[in-house]
């Protein structure tokens, strides 16, 4: 299948690599070309714009940074919807605004292009291991057509509803993670301060009621002072901002999410915005120096 892939960062490069390894023909675009080097070395074709990437392909995947990027990639002068063929399917895996997902889906429908919102969970580890969870919103027929592609990249693929439903589900996911990360990093700080060995602590708590993806994957990184990004702090702040905006629109108060937003904003202010979400530990250490 001819596939366009737009966005070859921490997540996108691995995801696209699985499709390439499965024998699909890729055309790729990324703002920084060097981040697509591995895919190009594997036989992918380079495109200079999202529109050029989309032209003549059957399916277009995108995973970029911010809603403004999504808007530009789809609706801009050199955007996907100005070049994709009628009957093509576009899939946005960026965590973005539900309202924007609905807007782009409607614009695509007017041109005969089905657009699915399909944000993912699982981080860099899930992307590398083809173990991502896809939360999908959009047309059911289009979903069934591209489901085999999702299954190459992930282990859980669920259609949640119409356009925007995938993004709403991702907001649920990020709300769960937000409070969980506070607990994870505070627990590490407590273990350190009390003189415990965090590794043996993990052996005790990792199989009980406190078990979680973060505990299994991020606790060992923190033990090794590895704060490199599986998911950037600055992108998590973006996600929480979207969730809080949606909550406000629905007249919801989410104090746990608001606290996480405050703490992660502090983390970014301390210079850790391009570190992984586990860098909240560094901010908590700073807070406790006072």
Where in this protein do the model-derived segments appear?
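Rossmann-like NAD(P)(H) cofactor-binding subdomain of soluble oxidoreductases
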Residues: 50-54, 59-60, 67-132
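Active-site-proximal catalytic alpha-helix in oxidoreductases
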Residues: 130, 134-137, 158, 162-194, ...
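Interdomain hinge/lid region at the active-site interface
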Residues: 167, 211-275
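NAD(P)-dependent dehydrogenase/reductase Rossmann-like domain
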Residues: 270-290
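Rossmann-fold dinucleotide-binding core
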Residues: 96-175
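Residues in the short beta-alpha loop(s) of Rossmann-like NAD(P)-binding domains
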Residues: 32, 66, 139
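NAD(P)+-binding Rossmann beta1-loop-alpha1 motif at the extreme N-terminus of oxidoreductases
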Residues: 1-62, 88, 93-94, 124
């Amino acid at each position: 299948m001819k596939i366009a892939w737009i966005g070859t960062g921490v997540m996108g490069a691995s995801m696209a690599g699985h499709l390439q390894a499965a024998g699909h023909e890729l055309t790729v675009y990324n703002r920084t070309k060097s981040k697509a080097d591995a895919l190009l070395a594997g036989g992918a074709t380079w495109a200079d714009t999202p529109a050029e990437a989309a032209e003549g392909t059957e399916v277009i995947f995108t995973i970029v940074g911010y809603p403004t990027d999504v808007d530009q990639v789809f609706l801009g002068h050199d955007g996907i919807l100005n070049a994709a063929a009628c009957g093509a399917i576009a899939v946005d895996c960026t965590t973005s605004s539900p309202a924007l997902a609905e807007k782009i889906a409607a614009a695509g429908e007017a041109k005969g292009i089905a657009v699915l919102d399909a944000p993912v969970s699982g981080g860099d580890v899930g992307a590398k291991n083809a173990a991502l969870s896809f939360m999908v919103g959009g047309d059911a027929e289009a979903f069934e057509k591209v489901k085999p592609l999702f299954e190459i990249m992930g282990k859980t693929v669920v259609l949640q509803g119409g356009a925007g439903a995938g993004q709403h589900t991702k907001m649920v996911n990020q709300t769960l993670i937000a409070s969980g990360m506070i607990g994870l990093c505070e627990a590490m700080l407590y273990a350190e301060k009390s003189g415990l060995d965090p590794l043996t602590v993990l052996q005790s708590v990792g199989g009980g009621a406190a078990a979680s993806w973060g505990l299994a994957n991020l606790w060992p990184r923190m033990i090794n002072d590895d704060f490199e990004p599986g998911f950037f702090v600055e992108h998590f702040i973006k996600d929480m901002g979207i969730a809080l905006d949606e909550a406000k629109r629905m007249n919801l108060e989410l104090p746990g999410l608001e606290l996480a937003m405050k703490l992660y904003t502090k983390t970014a202010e301390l210079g850790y915005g391009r570190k992984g979400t586990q860098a909240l530990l560094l901010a908590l250490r700073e807070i406790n120096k006072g």
